[in-house]
Structures are given as structure tokens and as C-alpha cells.
């Protein structure tokens, strides 16, 4: 579903972006668990557009997070309270970790729920519905 969404928006998307956790930095104690955002998107004014795993592209991510607007993205088959909680908690953790507030919060899903979509609207979380059919598993855009 992330690939289908990326086809609509393009940009540079990093997957499985770590937040919190005991990685040796002074922000978090050893009692903190590492969490991962499903994806963070940057408009990609600089550099190649595509979907990139954070684990192999951390320097590019760190450069982008300092120069571009970040969108936090959670991807779920169907919108649920867990996804909403993840994007809300992820906002605060991301801001503390990377010293920048996300410009946009997005939940990408195949199915909706009117009540939960209302909650998202009140909290300025975009809900984007995409076709759940699997797209190619690629790290870079098609040529």
C-alpha cells in the first residue's frame, strides 16, 4: 500500500525509521524501547525520488530531515485506533529525536471507519485510502 501511495505523491520515502530506544544517544534511557515509523516522506526537492529503507540510507535521511518537511506515515490494512495512536505518539517522539516537528501526519489504509476518520480529521491526520493490491516491492521508482 505504501508503494501505491508513493505513486500518488512521489518524493523520498524512508521506511522503518527508528524513534526512541537505547541506541547510545542521550535522549532515551536504556529502559526505552526502539520503535519504528512505517515511513517518513520528504518532498524530495534534492536527490533521487524513491522508497528507501532507513537502515541502508540513514545519512540521506539525516540530511533530508534537516532541510525538508517531514511527513509521518503509518500504513495499515484498515484504519484503527492503534494506527492513530502510533502516529500521535510518533509525532512527539520524532520531534524530540530529530528536533523538527512533522509537517503532515498520514495514515494510509485500504479500508475506513467513519468514526475513526472523524477523529483523524479533528487531529489533523490525513487518511488516504489506496487499493490493497500488492505493488512491486521496490526500493527505487520504476524507470
Language-model features: where?
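Charged, terminal alpha-helix-loop-beta segments
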Residues: 1-143
Amino acid at each position: 500500500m505504501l508503494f501505491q501511495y508513493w505513486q500518488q505523491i512521489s518524493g523520498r520515502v524512508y521506511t522503518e525509521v527508528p524513534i526512541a530506544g537505547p541506541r547510545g544517544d542521550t535522549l532515551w534511557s536504556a529502559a526505552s524501547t526502539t520503535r519504528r515509523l512505517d515511513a517518513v516522506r520528504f518532498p524530495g526537492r534534492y536527490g533521487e525520488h524513491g522508497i528507501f529503507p532507513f537502515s541502508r540510507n540513514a545519512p540521506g535521511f539525516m540530511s533530508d530531515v534537516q532541510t525538508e518537511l517531514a511527513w509521518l506515515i503509518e500504513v495499515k490494512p484498515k484504519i484503527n485506533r492503534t494506527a492513530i495512536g502510533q502516529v500521535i505518539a510518533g509525532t512527539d517522539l520524532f520531534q524530540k529525536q530529530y528536533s523538527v516537528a512533522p509537517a503532515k501526519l498520514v495514515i494510509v489504509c485500504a479500508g475506513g471507519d467513519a468514526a475513526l476518520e472523524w477523529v483523524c480529521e479533528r487531529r489533523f491526520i490525513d487518511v488516504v485510502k489506496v487499493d490493497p493490491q500488492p505493488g512491486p516491492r521496490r526500493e527505487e521508482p520504476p524507470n
